[in-house]
Amino acid sequence: MISLKHKLVLFYFLLLLTFSSCSFLNQNEPIPSYLYISEFRLKTQANQGSTSERITDIWLFNDTDFLGMFPLPAKIPLLLYGEQNLTIQAGIKENGIGATPENYPFFNPIKVKVNLKALKTDTLKLETSYLSTSKFHFIENFENNSSFFSFLVSGLPENRVLPYSDNNVFEGKFSGKIQVSKSAPIVTVGSNAKYKNTFNPGQPVYLEMDYKGEAPCVIGVQFYDTENIEEAGIIVPIAGFKESADWKKIYFNLGSTLALRKSLYYRVIFNTALPEGKENANVHFDNIKLISF
């Protein structure tokens, strides 16, 4: 049997070992500095449309390394100290999918100089803008009480994307909507104009929009070999969105689809189907922008 004296000796030995271990670990464990980014806004010029954005992540770099991608708002531990030159790029969810984050190629990277200290938190509120080399093929905000998307592929004339003004409007005076019903349960509409397909593999091309709706919607491209308005064209679906009671922002990547097709012309296409059990449904749109370099 272990005596009380031996138990006390063992207890103090273990206690000493514990403190020694903690001291050893603390001496070797690096102490981080912190960077807190609370928000990332978009500023636009008059010819670039709405400031609406959905910047969900930041991509962080210093002079030599990629430091990581972080969801907003972000408190980022860094093993960096003293004056640091950082580059911060705005990240989005490509096609609205959380598993496909991308640093959005059309937003200017933000360059900041910070003086980082151990355990100190530096707070940044960021604002970006479109790169001057961004090319806006069209911007549709419906504020002229007209629609850029009235080319009807299937459905009835009243099923085109029509401007409206009521309490569902996203911003400004007008938004646009497609209505599907029992009489026209599947509706496909396209941009009024055909565009020349001059894109190369790897060239970024995105369709931005704000949306909400009582039905899902698929975004695609209709390809043509000529400018003939009678040509039926080939529709290639790309991605879509589900029903949503609230307005959301989404960024569709059209680049790979446009580059892989050899067709000379294309339209942007929206396809909507009436959900089972509903008599009618509306899908709302605003701030539709087609952007490339």
Predicted regions mapped to residue ranges:
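C-terminal motif of bacterial Sec signal peptides marking the signal peptidase cleavage site
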Residues: 18-21
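Extra-cytoplasmic beta-strand recognition segments
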Residues: 142-143, 193-217, 252, 288
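Secreted extracellular polysaccharide-interacting domains
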Residues: 179-206, 228-239
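Extracellular carbohydrate recognition and processing domains
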Residues: 230-264, 278-279
